[in-house]
Amino acid sequence: MFRDFFSFRIFGDNLGMDLGTSTSSTLIYAKGKGIVLNMPSILAVGRKDGRIVAVGKEAKEMLGKTPQNIVVVRPLQNGVVADYDATQKMVEYFVSQIQPYHRLIGPKLVIGVPSRATKVEKKALVDIATHLGARQVQLVHEPVAAVIGANLPVSEPLGSMIVDIGGGTSEAAITSLDGVVISKHIRIAGDEMDQAIILYLKENHNLFVGEQMAERIKINIGCTHPPSRNEKMKMRGRDLSTGFPNEIEI
């Protein structure tokens, strides 16, 4: 059942949406086109009037560089809606990038949600999608979606284990017969790794780097076990002793 749904054989005009947390991205999938949008789930807004200054990639590039009158907002926390209005504005902007007239105008929308999401958190997502014009909204637990994406058994009486490391949370789950049998999550994930890199460089190399640089370090040379060969990377930041820009290689 779920595999048919995600392959979009049983619906006509559909979109699939994965709302990433914090600095991870929101993905939108369109039938026949694949992934049509991949943008960081971030907004930059005015502190006083709440006016949107930047969304997605442009907002992410402002991390650590915003003036006092602008603040970077992460409307999604731990995989669910933390700021309803900001999330609605962000999703509306994302949809406007792929659909004319800035509305969904009829598509059926599949949205991934954490398996631990409450009824209130799920309703918030449905309300946002309905406001944008989706004629039907289907929420699917993210572990089930991940199993389908990995082409593992989902409808059969077989267990599949999946570990999903996101931006704000990491979730491990066992799925079977179109559902989640058991799942556990911790609030340690990609963002926590970035902060650990920032702290390490500050304490061991007297260098302050921003979140974007920390993320690049994690992606380029981060590993979960001792590497077979030493990877090196040059990184730029601010020398905490002099206050001037500095570059080191690790």
Where are these regions (language model features)?
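Nucleotide/phosphate-binding catalytic cleft detector across ATP-hydrolyzing
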Residues: 1-165, 173-250
